[in-house]
């Protein structure tokens, strides 16, 4: 963990800590992986807390990684593995766009997220 406890992942940044905790709450259902969340948070802490672009970029990066693993598994006929990775990718995209304010950028994320990254 970057510098806080399991609950207060980003000391002094309640929004990021709370959003991370909400995401971690999905772990018992296989919707996220704690190790992946920890890696995201380590990268965020290294970039400096509070930058909403960093938040989106780091969560999106992990989502894209899972999406690529899902695509690969699907091609190989490993449907359960693919579905696990697609589920995690979706939750990471969802978590990443959490702090993008309403407007053109958020709309672009929904239309074509790759144009925003």
Over which residues does each language-model region extend?
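Hydrophobic/aromatic side-chain positions at a characteristic register within alpha-helices
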Residues: 67, 71-74, 81
């Amino acid at each position: 963990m970057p510098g806080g406890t399991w609950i207060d992942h980003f000391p002094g940044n309640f929004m990021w800590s709370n959003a991370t905790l909400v995401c971690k709450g999905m772990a018992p259902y296989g919707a996220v992986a704690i190790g992946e969340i920890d890696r995201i948070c380590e990268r965020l802490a290294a970039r400096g807390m509070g930058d909403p672009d960093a938040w989106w970029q780091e969560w999106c990066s992990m989502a894209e990684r899972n999406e690529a693993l899902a695509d690969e598994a699907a091609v190989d006929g490993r449907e359960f593995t693919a579905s696990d990775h697609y589920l995690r990718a979706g939750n990471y995209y969802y978590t990443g766009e959490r702090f993008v304010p309403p407007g053109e950028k958020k709309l672009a994320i929904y239309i074509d997220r790759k144009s925003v990254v």
